[in-house]
Regions:
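Generic N-terminal amphipathic, Lys/Arg-enriched alpha-helix
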Residues: 2-6, 19-26
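Glycine-rich flavin
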Residues: 38-46, 51-126
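A short alpha-helix capping/helix-coil boundary motif
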Residues: 17-21, 49-51
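N-terminal, positively charged, Ser/Thr/Ala/Gly-biased leader segments
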Residues: 7, 12-15
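Charged, low-complexity surface patches
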Residues: 12, 32-33, 64
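A glycine-/small-polar-enriched, mobile loop at the entrance of the PLP active site in fold-type I
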Residues: 24-34, 81-83
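A short, structure-level motif marking secondary-structure boundaries and short turns
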Residues: 12, 24-27, 56-57
Length: 126
């Protein structure tokens, strides 16, 4: 689902504000399903929300951290869980700037929907 044609050409905060109504509309489904619904993920990827902190070489915005925080805030107003998911992926995205460029490109550069996050699962969750 594309929110606006060529939305990825807009500034990250403008893209976040454009997709925020879709995030808000999905909030009950997110809570009930304990996951981001596929149609919302499509919208977030279409707006390149997960790529805000990625280096340009990997197809990201290479935004300042202050700008990324504004993106998270715009999404969090719509649904805090969605902002949390984006924030989790942001830590890995920032790491791309410190990796060998070829390695970072292999992870994020080939697929515009590539997202990486890590963390420990709750006991018994797997």
């Amino acid at each position: 689902m594309r929110v606006v044609q060529d939305l990825t050409m807009a500034a990250p905060l403008a893209r976040a504000r454009a997709v925020a109504p879709l995030v808000a509309a999905a909030a009950d489904r997110i809570e009930a399903g304990r996951e981001l619904p596929a149609d919302l993920l499509d919208a977030l990827h279409g707006a390149a929300i997960f790529r805000t902190l990625l280096p340009h070489a990997c197809g990201g915005d290479e935004a300042r951290l202050s700008e990324h925080v504004q993106v998270l805030e715009a999404i969090a107003v719509a649904d805090a869980s969605t902002a949390w998911c984006i924030g989790q992926a942001a830590g890995c995205s920032m790491a791309a700037a410190y990796m060998a460029p070829a390695a970072a490109y292999r992870v994020w550069g080939r697929d515009p929907r590539a997202v990486l996050a890590w963390g420990q699962a709750a006991p018994g969750a797997l």
